[in-house]
């Protein structure tokens, strides 16, 4: 299992209060394959740097989770098939080791 961070930009026409419940449908892929969801952080409606699908705003959400690489790939595939998801990005955060001097 590896740690991942997922950032999702959701269509602004979706109501903000339903964002977490609609994301949960996709995040079930992680838990059914044995992964864990550490944190779901809904940033809310933000202005985009450039228009995506003729929209200048989007609802941002960041999810930290642990899963197998195949599970992360499947999650990205399922998110890309949904029309309300404007953009996704899954990254593996670097190990941040602090060296004491």
From Swiss-Prot:
Q: What does this protein do?
A: Binds together with bS18 to 16S ribosomal RNA.
User: What does the record give under GO molecular function?
Assistant: small ribosomal subunit rRNA binding; structural constituent of ribosome
Return the PROSITE patterns for the record: RIBOSOMAL_S6
**Which one Pfam family would you cite for this protein?**
Ribosomal_S6
Q: Does the keyword Kinase apply?
A: no
- Which gene is this protein's source? rpsF
Q: Which SUPFAM superfamilies match?
A: Ribosomal protein S6
Protein name per Swiss-Prot or TrEMBL: Small ribosomal subunit protein bS6
Of the GO CC terms on this record, one is: cytoplasm
- Gene3D superfamilies attached here? 3.30.70.60
